[in-house]
Amino acid sequence: MGRSYGGRVLAAMTLLGIPAAVLVALAAQLLFQLQAGRAELRRVRTDGLHPELDPDAGLPEAAAGALLPLATALAALAQVLGLSCLLLAALCGHLGAELARGPGPGRSDWFLYDCRLLRHSALGLFCCGVSVYLAALAIYALLLFEIEAGAAAASILGSGALILVAIMTHTLFRAVQATRRGLRELSPPSFEDEPARPSEDSKSGCRAQPPQDEETETPIGAVTHQGSHF
């Protein structure tokens, strides 16, 4: 039972670390694309708008110049959140695997049971990173495409980010409630210390038996002594 618990936790942390690494890579790619867009915007500012360009092809220059730093900051924040989630998942998985190699297999299960707050934090960081990345991607779509298509894409991505934040908040709140309820109603998984308890009980029982034997031997000795007087 202990090994199955630890195995499930390690598998969950692995499944969380893979999309966190993908999120870090996507945020880094978006950062480079936004940097290229900023260089293009600077070139347009220095060269001036060509008369043959359609002014309705995208956002105005002032709006684009204001949204580009915001999108860059959001992409960098998404990368930091994804990297933090990846490091927490890797740390919990590595320490759990190292403790499983010890003399007692229950040490790993106790550690993974006690670090559930870190696992909840890693999941929250990942969901926040995805939400921030969707917000940055919405701004980038608004800058890249035409006004109509960019506004539609930005609204869809922004609504998805808000829905994800709401789901994440509700899920983490329920997880915290379930954890507190489990700590009150359920006992933590028994792994290593319980097999030692019966041996201690048996030793204490063996130590308690000799005084009883002495008490039973005392009346017998008294009876034999009285018989000798008769």
UniProtKB/Swiss-Prot annotation:
The keyword Transmembrane helix applies. Keywords: Membrane, Transmembrane, Transmembrane helix. It is a multi-pass membrane protein. InterPro entries: Jiraiya, TM221. Residues 194-204 have a biased composition (Basic and acidic residues). GO terms for cellular component: membrane. Residues 184-230 are annotated as: Disordered. It is found in: Membrane. Pfam families: Jiraiya. The chain crosses the membrane at residues 12-32, 73-93, 125-145, 147-167. PANTHER family: TRANSMEMBRANE PROTEIN 221 (PTHR36132:SF1). This is Transmembrane protein 221. It comes from Mus musculus (Mouse).
